[in-house]
Every structure is written in C-alpha cells, then in structure tokens.
C-alpha cells in the first residue's frame, strides 16, 4: 500500500518505522527544517528518511499548488501524519482513496491543538494517551480509529511523559496499521460537546505567578522541565529557572513570592508553598535549591517576582479610531479594566464613551479621520498598537452611498495603514465576515476559503471588496515591508450599544437594532426575502475578549494571522432571531409601555435595500485560528445576548409619552 507521510519529532520517526514494519511503501516524506532556537532532543525524520533511501522534503508551504500537484503524481493510497506541525489542506487529504490519518498525543476530543503533552501536565491531569484519527479540514476533529490510554504519575515530567507517549504510540500503530492496510477499521465520531482545544506554548508562558497555589506552580514546572525551556521567576532583575520542585502544604502568612526558608528553598504561594529542588541562575549551571538561594543572594523574607523589577513597564499605548463605535467603546472598557494600557481615541461623537471621559488613562479628541490627518499621524507615531475601526458597515449604505463607503472604508483606512508602515507600528485591522461573500464552504476558513462576490452592477459588494483589498494590502506590507499586523473578522457581533434607535429609524443599523425599533414603535418586523438567511451571532463580550487577546499577543502568536471571531454554535436565521427577540420582548417588565406587536411582514430585498443588493444564505466561521492563536472560544448563548441587548435599548426609550 503506497503512502505519503508527513512527520516530525520522535513520533515522526517511530511512525515511519511502524509503517515500514507493517509493509507500507513510503513514496515520500515531508518534514520540517529544525528551528535553531529550539533544543533538538528528538530524532531526525530527515536523517531517518535518508538512511532508509526515501525521498524527503521540507517545503515552507506544503499546501502550495505545486506541492499538491507533486503529491498527486505520487498517487498515494493512504496518507499519514505523525506530529507534522502544519495543517494539511483538504486538496491533499482528498488525494488518498483510503483516506488520511493523524497521530495525536492526547485522548481526543480532549486537548486538540498544540502541545497536548505540556498542557495536560500544566492542568494537573492524571491520564492522557494517544489517538489515531481520520484527518478532516478541521484540526484534530476527524473520527477516531484507535486510542490508547496511559496514566500520568505524580512524578512524571514532560520528558518522562513524552517517553510514555512514544511507547504507547508504537503499541497503537503496531495494532492498527495492519487493519488500515486491509480496510478493516471501526471509526467512532468525536463528541464535539466534549472537545477542548489549546494553542502552542512559548517560553514566555512559563513564568511563575506566585499568587497561584503551589500545586499549580509545581504542575507548570513539571510541564516545562528540561529539555523544555523551564519555568522561571526573578529576584529583582535577575532571572532564574526552576527545573524541579515539590509542593509543601506549608501554612504561612507570608506574602506570595516570599522566601520562607533557604535550606530547603521554600517559597510562599497563594496556597501552600513550593520547594525549589533544583534550578539555575541566568545562563549558569543547574544546582540544588539551597545553593541556588546562596547564588541569588536570597535570605528568609526575600521577595521573588514574576517580572524584572525594573520593568514596571510603561503602559501600552493603544490608538482606537472610531472609539465611540460599537466595538471601540466596549474595547476601551476592557482595556481600561487592566492597569497597563493607555487608550487614545478619536471619533465624531462621544455618547457611548462618556463613562470614560474622566478616566486618567483615556484620552479623547472629537474629530473626523478625513479631516484630522495630522493628529492621526502624530498619534500613530506615538502609540504602540493601532486599531482603525472607522467604517460604514450597514448594508443599506452599500447600495445607497457606495462611493462614500469606498472613500471612508478604503481610502481613509489605506492612509492609516501607510502611517503604520512608515512608523513601524503594529496594526490590528478589522476585516469582516463580508469578505467571504457567497462562499459555499460549510465553515468559512481564513486560510483556505475562497472569497466570492457578485457582479459589478451589484454595489452591495463595495464594502466587501474594499475590506478584502485592504486585507491584501496589509498582507503584502507584512510580507514585503515587515508590517506587524493581525486581521480579525467579526461575525455578527451583538450587544448593548450596537448602533442606536435613531440610526435604525433611517434604516442605517444592523439587524437586531432594526427589529427592536419595530417592536418599540409597533411597526411590522420586516423579513427581507423571508428572513431565511442564516448568520452566526456572537456576544460582544466574547468578541471583545478575543480582540483583547489579540492586543495582548502572547508569544507574538497573532502576528501575520487572520482570525475569525464568531460563534458557530449560535447560528440562526433572521426570522428565528426575530422570533427569539419577540419572545424576550413579551416577557420584559417594560413591555406594557409599548404598542401591540404588529406582526411579521415579508419584503423583497430590492424594495428595502435597493436594486443593487444581493444576500448570502449562510455565514458560519471556522474558529480554529482563534483556538490556536488565542486559546479562545465563545461562551455566551445567543438568548442571553438577545435579552441583554433588548433590555439595554428598551431602557434608553423615553417612556413619558408611552401607554402604560
């Protein structure tokens, strides 16, 4: 049976050996070049392939059409992936008649994604395992073919658990590969409601936060012990690494991070105490805890800290253009909740941000981005992160004022993008789910879905193509000029302060605000073309949390990424949205102040939006990039969002002239 293999690390080597032992013919192996910044304690797939006389390749992008064509020419019967670090495109997966299979180091559906070995230790799990599953477009989501459980011992660290996983993988492949070869396998679909997903870890994720319980910190030490980079802390500005530790149920009133004793080296934690058994000062040698204390100059009562003492860092300056808008004002609230951000904002109004105007770390100027170009350029230069949130994003305006949409959404934003290139500033740019247009994929994927729009004589697409072209310009600046960027694509975010009822009165608002206005005024709810179009509605709090994590950019994981931010579980048609909103309205304590419900009315899109309008039937995001880059998933149910949005708007209505 001919196979093409994608492999890396020890698991890649043992997977190749297992295939050869089972009688598979390996036509080619795809692997990675080693990262010089990574400690290579594992076997070399490239060396093994060379020794076995198998062609081996390490392309930067195996999903490039040229490589897809070359793999197709190999005519594989089956494809295997053993710890290959990149997603393999569906075009490649479909080349093998018997399918494609991946070896994953966890008990799927738990711990999908990156670094499951480390994450199970960080989280204090007592069991993990290996899973062989069928590969599909979504990472680690295909049906399970075989699974083997292993116990995690209390004294296991990353390397001992790695060896256990390798041993289990050999057993699993030895048992399963012959069955795949003969087409005799039983597949079990994964339970999506049990799935968890984790992103990759970086050394910066491993600093010891002493306010946490000692057991949590001990698990961190276990998870990143040598040959991983280790857990670390600081004494003043001196960094040191903890290689091994023990938990002590020490009852102490000492502040977390305080040295309780130096022999043994015992540190107070949020709960209990952590003994540092072995460690290393700076780039020195490994030594036992009491010697480390002496080297670092520690005495009883000394304080450790998670960051260098001199880096009580300057607040990150964030420039938000369009700060009074729906996303801008909620994001401002989230940033000011922390103590390390300074927010600079510009907008043509301030009603939504009035609650921040006296905040010492919020600086607002009322103005228009098309007029205040000098102010904007100065503040792009001054700030660290730029979010240009100004745009016309209401569908009726696409057909009513297409040129104004282009001028504001494209031309003005292009100028800001070029300022970011000029001053080498990080830009977080709001793309849109609209760029996917009439894409027919079940899930809209940032990296693989086609962006499909209608003909030129349908001006409703001017917003979509303006945003798409800016996405491409930003991407090109990233590739050619080193622009640090992240593109995020909101999928139907909803919540309080989404537009306002006055905007809805002139038709210039999003769907839920328009529907609320209909209920408030006792006018029929208009269902455009029957309201069967489906969307995935996302609570503003979920969306803002994802956007906040993009700004935080832990480990620079968001650089150069496109990230959908949406809730694929909250899918509903516009008609269903209207029905849910109506039910919430009828139960609201202020209901008696408003006129009777006037019913639903079906209208044609051309009569509502104008003749240049086209709609799309569905728009569901893949959120695998959000899982991978942000460790994020949406949590808030659509009904809760509807209830809170409705309540907010009803309480803004002047009830003095309403019936009681």
Swiss-Prot record:
Assigned EC number: 2.1.2.13, 1.1.1.305
InterPro entries: Arna-like_SDR_e (IPR045869), Bifun_polymyxin_resist_ArnA (IPR021168), Epimerase_deHydtase (IPR001509), Formyl_trans_C (IPR005793), Formyl_transf_N (IPR002376), Formyl_transf_N_sf (IPR036477), Formyl_transferase-like_C_sf (IPR011034), Lipid_A_modif_metabolic_enz (IPR050177)
Residue ranges, annotated region (Formyltransferase ArnAFT): 1-304
Pathway(s) annotated for this protein in UniProt: Nucleotide-sugar biosynthesis; UDP-4-deoxy-4-formamido-beta-L-arabinose biosynthesis; UDP-4-deoxy-4-formamido-beta-L-arabinose from UDP-alpha-D-glucuronate: step 1/3; Nucleotide-sugar biosynthesis; UDP-4-deoxy-4-formamido-beta-L-arabinose biosynthesis; UDP-4-deoxy-4-formamido-beta-L-arabinose from UDP-alpha-D-glucuronate: step 3/3; Bacterial outer membrane biogenesis; lipopolysaccharide biosynthesis
Assigned GO CC terms: membrane
Superkingdom to which the source organism belongs: Bacteria
Catalytic-site annotation from UniProt: 104 (proton donor), 434 (proton acceptor), 619 (proton donor)
Keyword vocabulary terms for this entry: Antibiotic resistance, Lipid A biosynthesis, Lipid biosynthesis, Lipid metabolism, Lipopolysaccharide biosynthesis, Multifunctional enzyme, NAD, Oxidoreductase, Transferase
SUPFAM superfamilies in UniProt: FMT C-terminal domain-like (SSF50486), Formyltransferase (SSF53328), NAD(P)-binding Rossmann-fold domains (SSF51735)
Any one Pfam family match given in the protein's UniProt record, by short name: Formyl_trans_N
Residues under site feature: Raises pKa of active site His: 140
UniProt site positions, description: Transition state stabilizer: 102
Residues where UDP-alpha-D-glucuronate binds: 393, 398, 432-433, 460, 492, 526-535, 613
Keyword Cell membrane attributed: no
Protein's UniProt keywords contain Transcription: no
One annotated GO molecular function: carboxy-lyase activity
Any GO BP annotation: lipid A biosynthetic process
Residues where NAD(+) binds: 347, 368-369
Region (Dehydrogenase ArnADH): 314-660
Residue positions binding (6R)-10-formyltetrahydrofolate: 86-88, 114, 136-140
Bilayer-spanning residue ranges: none
Similarity comment text for this entry: In the N-terminal section; belongs to the Fmt family. UDP-L-Ara4N formyltransferase subfamily.
Function comment: Bifunctional enzyme that catalyzes the oxidative decarboxylation of UDP-glucuronic acid (UDP-GlcUA) to UDP-4-keto-arabinose (UDP-Ara4O) and the addition of a formyl group to UDP-4-amino-4-deoxy-L-arabinose (UDP-L-Ara4N) to form UDP-L-4-formamido-arabinose (UDP-L-Ara4FN). The modified arabinose is attached to lipid A and is required for resistance to polymyxin and cationic antimicrobial peptides.
Known partners and oligomeric status: Homohexamer, formed by a dimer of trimers.
Protein name: Bifunctional polymyxin resistance protein ArnA
Lineage of the organism: Bacteria, Pseudomonadati, Pseudomonadota, Gammaproteobacteria, Enterobacterales
Encoding gene (name): arnA
